[in-house]
Amino acid sequence: KAPEHFLDANGIRQVSEEARTGRRGFIRHAFAAAAAATATPVAWSHGNPIPPEGGDPNILNLPEHATGLGQGVATEGYGKPSKYESNIQRRQSPGLTQTSQASVSFAPLQSLFGIVTPSGLHFERHHQGWWDIDPSKHRFMINGMVKTPTVLTMDEIMRLPAVSRFHFIECGANTAVEWGNVAVPTVQYTHGMISCSEFTGVPLITLLEMAGADLKQGKFVLAEGADGSSMTRTIPMSLITSGEVLVAYGQNGEMLRPENGYPLRLVVPGVQGVSWVKY
């Protein structure tokens, strides 16, 4: 398995010194080392060797799972990964920020398959921490250049026609840890501020039309989140009228996770993740 933590101080120092000799030389040495490793025969390159006399105990001795009863149905009301996969987690970069409430956690890309990021491993980016908001008390408000200022509850939003779409979201700072130099061991820390999910929600244009928004004179929508930072971003009306922007409540077949905006967030394809305003 790929290492899950940063290089130690000596490793970082060595990488830094090698990088100073020039990027081309650094890459040339890396390829040379890789070629040498490929040319060197190793015992495991052709599969496991035939076990010594007596056989493989993992085959000959029946394990407990082959002889006894396992766990019953609904032992876990909400399924979770195997304990043998416990090393696959979101991780934060030590010292990146002074507080974890205004920081980022990285998705373990090197350990994932396909294009969908499990909701529990989706990268995080917060500006004032995350909250588990009571959906029964949450409100979605529309005002400004509209005929009817509108307030919607979660129940009202979820009764409207919805769509489900796969979208990538990426933080604008993705890969920033290597802008200065190579200093981390896996793509989790270099590219882990990107994730892909199937999002479910109502097109924002539907809600604006309900409120009688002036779609011709209005050029932008100012989206504001309900967290302590009052995160705001402008969204071009051209994106909204295309039907691409969603007011989403679902992620990968279930409700959004609190770390990713539960119970409601914007999905704004094609722009930096900071515009996907949460809460």
What annotation goes with each model-predicted range?
Residues 17, 34-36, 63, 93:
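Compositionally biased, low-complexity segments enriched in small residues
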Residues 7, 16, 31, 48-50, ...:
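Compositionally biased, intrinsically disordered low-complexity segments enriched
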Residues 11, 34, 38-43, 61, ...:
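Glycine-centered secondary-structure boundary/capping sites
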Residues 23-48:
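N-terminal export signals
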